[in-house]
């Protein structure tokens, strides 16, 4: 099964239109269905990305302060006496577990605030530097280290301060209740379903910094229908039907457009019949206007028109 992620309409193509709406929102014009003004951000200021939370010591002096104030021994941290040793420690795969143990203490909050917080993407590459906006957000970062130690991902919601630097608004464990049905089928040992879920989820390997990527990531972790319906198409075909061998998921694309004063992204899944080559498409729609995306349409037939 071949999956392909394409962007039919980029946010840049809509920039002039987007800025025009933004000008209205700055004047406090409210949307028709809410009490607060619509908030749109130019230049893709919002982030909705999946990855792992890690942290590093920015200086040797902070590492020594951590060593002295925590119950960890020098042997646990490794002998760090110079910048080379510090770099070695920062690359240590066991560091998140050690930091979780030490930074969980309220006495070490001042050290936690000085740490260099990082989001690694799902492929393990350093993607963003993170800035907690409050004591609560710092607590979330520390707690997220426990997920990293178990190789469990988080969803980061935030806004860009500058290139590569993100202010943290919220951290959400990626094992969401919305995927409970999916998880139960995975536990059943269904190899075909497991492979399908892994393939679709692999599309979360993006930076989550465009409306298209934010919508895609939201759907992947908040809409179980994507997996359940795709499995039906691919593996629950009707023997007497036109495609007894089922369908293949051949393409996933995102179309973002302005609907009134709201930005709506349609995440479209294209299926092709193995026997006939006939195609059909289904979509999930997400409102990506504000910092927190939300689902508008769970699963509906997509009919393309020109």
PLM-predicted stretches and their roles:
Residues 31-34, 234, 283:
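Generic recognition of cysteine residues
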Residues 166-171, 248-251, 262-268, 291-303:
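Short, well-ordered strand-loop elements centered on a beta-strand within folded domains, enriched
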Residues 173-278:
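Long, positively charged binding patches that form subdomain-scale interaction surfaces
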Residues 2-201:
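Extended, non-transmembrane interaction/recognition domains
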Residues 142-145, 219, 223, 286:
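Hydrophobic, Leu/Ile/Phe/Ala-enriched alpha-helical segments that form helix-helix packing faces
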Residues 272-301:
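A short, surface-exposed beta-strand/turn
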